[in-house]
């Protein structure tokens, strides 16, 4: 969306902005805003992102984790991240399987320039609210179990819910919602 819309949202009190695409992030970047990378991130784009964002919400593989560590170590910075979980098990979505989340947490904790902050997911594309609710409930249970095991230092955020399902996500413990189209309007591709 146009930069003017971001400015207007900022003037209305929005401070954190998410972007799905690295190129669009680079075009819209303003250092006054807190930027989160929320879309799929390829390893070769990490070097372009780490200087621009305050959090990467879409970490879903060990090679990506290693590249973030490498780029952050070069800059002597620590990057807050969320682990993206493919809660709906949809093949067209990114994220690690729910069953692998605990093992992936252990990997994240090995890197000194990575600051694990929680989990992120994208709900299933479904008209059936009970299907979405079931996925969100599973995410909530996973988040709470990991928070109990590792502490709130590593599990501060459950980023779950977008413009179409954020109300349901809030019922299941989300404390970070991603409201792109409801605030900015639908994307023009």
Features from the language model and the residues they span:
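Conserved alpha/beta-domain cores
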Residues: 1-150, 154-166, 170-172, 184
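Gly/Pro- and small hydrophobic-enriched strand-loop and loop-to-helix capping segments
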Residues: 174-189
């Amino acid at each position: 969306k146009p930069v003017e819309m971001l400015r207007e949202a900022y003037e209305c009190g929005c401070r954190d902005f998410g972007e799905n695409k690295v190129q669009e992030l680079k075009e819209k970047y303003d250092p006054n805003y807190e930027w989160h990378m929320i879309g799929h991130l390829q390893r070769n784009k990490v070097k372009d992102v780490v200087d621009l964002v305050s959090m990467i919400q879409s970490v879903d593989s060990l090679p990506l984790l290693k590249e973030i560590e490498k780029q952050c170590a070069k800059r002597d910075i620590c990057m807050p991240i969320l682990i993206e979980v493919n809660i709906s098990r949809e093949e067209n979505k990114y994220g690690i399987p729910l069953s692998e989340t605990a093992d992936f947490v252990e990997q994240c904790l090995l890197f000194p320039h990575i600051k694990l902050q929680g989990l992120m997911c994208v709900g299933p594309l479904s008209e059936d609210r009970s299907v979405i609710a079931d996925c969100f409930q599973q995410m909530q249970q996973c988040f709470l179990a990991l928070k109990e095991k590792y502490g709130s230092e590593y599990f501060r955020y459950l980023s779950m819910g977008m413009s179409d399902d954020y109300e349901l996500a809030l019922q299941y413990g989300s404390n970070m919602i991603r409201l792109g189209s409801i605030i900015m309007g639908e994307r023009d591709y």
